[in-house]
């Protein structure tokens, strides 16, 4: 359906002081604080988790050396989605509007809608982090207490008891990250790099990260998180997170949160010969997801 003069009646009359409602600022590219962006030329992308060797055993004198096998553990798949939106304007609405270039106004609004959807899609990975029906390559949700290992054991990137963001829960999470193991149970050197929080926790995060002394105590102890340089990239607020007390710590895992761009954002405009309507369309294709769940440690909040 095209935007017609009936929908813009006030803009056809002289004496209108202002048009408003579409001049708000917008949250842009918050996904870049979390995701590494790569291009794609396929309908989907797959990444395979490899399993290396276990700990080397002792070889007894005169005995044969032990052999080990390498395997593929699981596959993470990124299915690209097509995101598109369009609008049309009648010839008469364009001709009779007295106040601005109506097409330019709604083209800007089209870009705003596309940008909003991208941020919602990016945040959905974290918003679904504790949902057992939304799983990654290993068959578990992003944050779980029982991610399976190929050796038969498990590892956890979620606390066994859900906790709110505070000094203790943050320190416990960083300790847990330092204890992560690979698919064969070997210790790996990972560290927390950045805290991801909803807007409701930004003041708590600032006190935890920036106070010289321990926050919320009368002790004269140093703030260990600050003095030890933990979380070197600080914290970032994501305004599209829906859980008001969940928090996440990103790690320096090589293949973690990924954003694949299949088709960059493009806009098109054409005239309909029969009606004279002008039609405008925006379209892009992309996917958001994660490969290695060791890329994050998350708590849903108490």
Model-predicted segments: where are they?
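Short low-complexity stretches enriched in small and charged residues
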Residues: 2-6, 37-46, 64-67, 89, ...
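N-terminal alpha-helical "arm" segments
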Residues: 1-27
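Glycine-rich, mobile lid/loop segments that gate access to catalytic sites or pores
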Residues: 116-156
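Assembly/oligomerization interface modules of large self-assembling protein complexes
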Residues: 25-83
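Long, contiguous amphipathic alpha-helices that act as assembly "spine/axial" helices in icosahedral shell
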Residues: 75-133, 195, 280-282
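A generic local secondary-structure boundary/capping motif
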Residues: 75, 184-185
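Sequence/fold signature of self-assembling virion shell proteins
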Residues: 2-10, 141-183, 189-194, 200-302
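Generic structural "secondary-structure junction" signal
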Residues: 80, 96, 128, 136, ...
């Amino acid at each position: 359906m095209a935007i017609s003069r009936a929908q813009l009646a006030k803009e056809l009359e002289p004496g209108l002081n202002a048009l408003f409602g579409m001049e708000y600022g917008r949250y842009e590219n918050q996904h870049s604080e979390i995701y590494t962006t790569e291009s794609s030329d396929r309908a989907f992308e797959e990444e395979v988790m490899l399993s290396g060797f276990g700990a080397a055993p002792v070889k007894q004198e005169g005995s044969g050396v032990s052999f080990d096998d390498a395997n593929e553990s699981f596959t993470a798949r990124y299915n690209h989605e097509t995101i598109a939106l369009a609008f049309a304007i009648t010839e008469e609405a364009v001709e009779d509007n007295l106040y601005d270039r109506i097409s330019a106004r709604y083209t800007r609004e089209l870009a705003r809608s596309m940008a909003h959807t991208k941020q919602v899609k990016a945040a959905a990975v974290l918003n679904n982090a504790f949902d057992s029906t939304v799983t990654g390559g290993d068959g578990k949700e992003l944050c779980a207490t029982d991610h399976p290992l190929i050796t038969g054991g498990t590892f956890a990137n979620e606390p066994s008891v859900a906790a709110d963001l505070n000094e203790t829960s943050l320190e416990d999470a960083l300790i847990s990250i330092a204890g992560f193991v690979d698919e064969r149970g070997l210790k790996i050197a990972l560290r927390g790099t950045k805290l991801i929080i909803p807007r409701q926790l930004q003041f708590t995060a600032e006190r935890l990260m920036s106070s010289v002394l321990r926050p919320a105590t009368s002790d004269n102890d140093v703030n260990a998180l600050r003095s030890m340089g933990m979380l070197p990239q600080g914290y970032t607020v994501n305004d599209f997170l829906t859980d008001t007390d969940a928090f996440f710590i990103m790690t320096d895992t090589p293949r973690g949160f990924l954003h694949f761009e299949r088709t960059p954002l493009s806009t098109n405009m054409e005239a309909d010969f029969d009606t004279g309507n002008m039609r405008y369309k925006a379209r892009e294709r992309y996917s958001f997801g994660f490969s290695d769940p060791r890329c994050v440690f998350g708590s849903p909040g108490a």
